[in-house]
Amino acid sequence: NEEERKLLPENFSLGNSNYFARFRETMSGHVPEQSIQKYFEAQSVWDDTMATQAIRILQRNPQQILVVIVGDFHAQYGGGLPDRIRQRGFENVYVISQVDLTELSEQEKSSTVIPHPQWGPRGDWIWTSGNPPISSPHQ
């Protein structure tokens, strides 16, 4: 309703189509299919709210570096929080994605650290724990 819309962050928009596709893939089987759109709307509000708060801090403290620690999905592969901060005029945004490789097979390790064929790189840097993949071209 209109009253609730007033509570949304300024210039609110839903995440892009790739972000929605990843979200749908991740949520499939966890929530009813007919509810995925509503959950995605909530995810997008969350991302926009975090971006709005980050921008406020950066505007008040332009000489500072802001580190935001969020769940991986909000930052990996684009579409979430980093994109929303960039859309608001702040270009110096970097994503460090932390991945525990300890329990993964060699194929899982490689598919986790090399850029995804559809989504691209999971971040600007990937911080791994455990053993890196034996044949990773990005070591």
Segments the model singles out, each with a brief description of its role:
Residues N1-I55:
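A substrate-binding/cap region within the structured catalytic cores of diverse enzymes
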Residues V45, T49-R60, Q64-V67, F73-Q139:
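C-terminal regions of proteins
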